């Protein structure tokens, strides 16, 4: 895969940690992000509490960390492995769907993203029922917005950005929500880049 000089997720996370971020008091379930850090050799460490089976965790975390590096093909393979190990692991299907959206390059495969989510369950309601926690349901909702929301891609990008903002504001200690929200801001500009957008991200 050809690599481009673009901001990494690490840079986006650092930028979003600056003081201009508005802190939001959340009434959501209490999650301990600091004590649930997982280290995947060669890729890095992260915290992403989830309800997947223990045997599917390494593949899932590998998939998310590969997303950080924009290694979409390898990430999709890792998420599918997590699905094989736990067929009801909702976030593994969320992760695979994420690999079919490349917002910084304006690349989007809606059919593959929808197919990944439909393998979890045939309807939005059934997919939501597969997610045991409110936070996981919110993650699923963001990707549903991107792949199933009516309207042109630009409209769906804006709706996805709003859904990611809501997720980030509900779980301000969730670094993954913070990073994916930053990426959604950049993706909402339909491939164009400007200073104001980068500052917002």
Language model segments and positions:
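Bacterial N-terminal signal peptides
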Residues: 8-19
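N-terminal pre-domain segments of enzymes
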Residues: 24-53
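Amphipathic alpha-helical repeat scaffolds of TPR domains
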Residues: 54-62, 88-100, 128-151, 173-191
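Canonical positions in the second alpha-helix
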Residues: 81-82, 120, 167
């Amino acid at each position: 895969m050809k690599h481009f000089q673009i901001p990494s997720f690490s840079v986006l996370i650092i930028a979003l940690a600056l003081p201009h971020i508005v802190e939001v008091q959340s009434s959501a379930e209490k999650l301990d992000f600091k004590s649930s850090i997982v280290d995947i050799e060669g890729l890095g460490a992260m915290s992403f509490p989830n309800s997947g089976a223990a045997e599917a965790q390494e593949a899932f975390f590998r998939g998310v960390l590969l997303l950080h590096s924009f290694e979409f093909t390898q990430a999709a393979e890792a998420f599918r492995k997590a699905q094989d190990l736990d067929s009801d692991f909702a976030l593994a299907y969320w992760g695979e769907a994420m690999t079919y959206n490349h917002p910084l390059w304006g690349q989007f495969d809606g059919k593959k993203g929808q197919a990944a989510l439909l393998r979890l369950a045939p309807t939005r309601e059934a997919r939501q029922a597969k997610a045991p926690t409110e936070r996981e349901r919110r993650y699923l909702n963001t990707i549903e917005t991107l792949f199933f929301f009516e309207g042109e891609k630009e409209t769906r990008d804006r709706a996805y950005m709003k859904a990611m903002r809501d997720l980030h504001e509900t779980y301000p200690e969730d670094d993954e929500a913070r990073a994916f929200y930053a990426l959604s801001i950049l993706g909402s500009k339909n491939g164009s880049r400007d200073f104001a957008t980068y500052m917002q991200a």
